[in-house]
């Protein structure tokens, strides 16, 4: 699916640049938006309906892409007392536009995340002091999102913290991007190791549980950007080195804030679609 979005092109051109030699990096720049909503799943795992939050603020082309593919999704049936059960779940979806030539973009559904609880019901944040924004990044105008994943004991203390991925909203050399990713990841992980979480409501009594917690470093972006394209350079995804953690893909579909327990999500069995 190729769509011309003048606003996307203007945004990609306006992405802050810190280097003269950045051709290969510019080719990797993407624009994306993360949308939230609900999805109704029948007992057999088929989609019986869905709704996107604040749909009037979402580009019609994006809504059309979702309408084309979401109804065809199929999930692993949810079992309750040994019986398949219909369920309304909460979802977040990342739609990505990647430049193809001078005036076209390939638009696709990159990631999706599904949860049985609304974001506000996924536990209380407890003691989660935000990380310090690295001064060097502020001076250089570098912003981005660090997708942290933490392993928590039954007392709510963080046992392990790991940065799965760091996406940056800046153009720079490959070397500089790697340095900025490392700097922001270190800041996020330093804070994450001091966090305290309440008991995971879905797994009382478990010795440990795992959650994804995105950390957004933003300069002057306090406005609501829901339904708007945002340009960034995606970083590589690295799963945590812990054994026994079931991850349904990377963290890219998660909103920029919140606590998202891992291992209790609904499992999508079919491709997401879009290209």
Predicted ranges, named:
Residues 1-8:
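Bacterial N-terminal signal peptides that target proteins for export
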Residues 14-17:
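N-terminal signal peptide c-region/cleavage motif recognized by signal peptidases
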Residues 19-275:
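Charge-biased low-complexity segments
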């Amino acid at each position: 699916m190729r769509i011309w979005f003048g606003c996307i092109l203007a945004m990609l051109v306006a992405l802050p640049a810190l280097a003269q030699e950045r051709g290969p990096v510019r080719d990797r720049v993407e624009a994306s938006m993360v949308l939230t909503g609900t999805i109704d799943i029948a007992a057999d795992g088929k989609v019986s309906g869905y709704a996107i939050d604040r749909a009037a603020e979402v580009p019609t082309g994006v809504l059309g892409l979702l309408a084309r593919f979401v109804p065809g999704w199929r999930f692993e049936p949810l079992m309750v007392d040994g019986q398949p059960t219909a369920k309304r779940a909460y979802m977040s979806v990342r739609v990505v536009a990647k430049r193809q030539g001078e005036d076209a973009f390939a638009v696709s559904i990159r990631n999706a995340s599904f949860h049985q609880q609304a974001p506000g019901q996924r536990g209380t944040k407890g003691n989660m002091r935000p990380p310090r924004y690295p001064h060097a990044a502020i001076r250089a105008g570098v912003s981005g999102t660090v997708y942290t994943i933490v392993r928590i004991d039954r007392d709510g203390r963080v046992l392990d913290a790991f940065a799965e991925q760091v996406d940056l909203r800046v153009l720079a050399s490959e070397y500089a991007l790697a340095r900025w990713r490392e700097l922001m990841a270190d800041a996020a992980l330093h804070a994450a190791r001091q966090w305290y979480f309440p008991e995971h409501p879905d797994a009382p009594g478990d010795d440990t549980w795992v959650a994804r917690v995105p950390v957004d470093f933003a300069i002057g972006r306090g406005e609501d950007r829901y339904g708007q394209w945002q340009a960034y350079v995606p970083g590589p995804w690295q799963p945590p080195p812990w054994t026994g953690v079931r991850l349904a893909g990377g963290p890219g579909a998660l909103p920029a804030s919140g606590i998202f327990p891992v291992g209790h999500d609904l499992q999508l069995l079919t491709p997401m679609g879009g290209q």
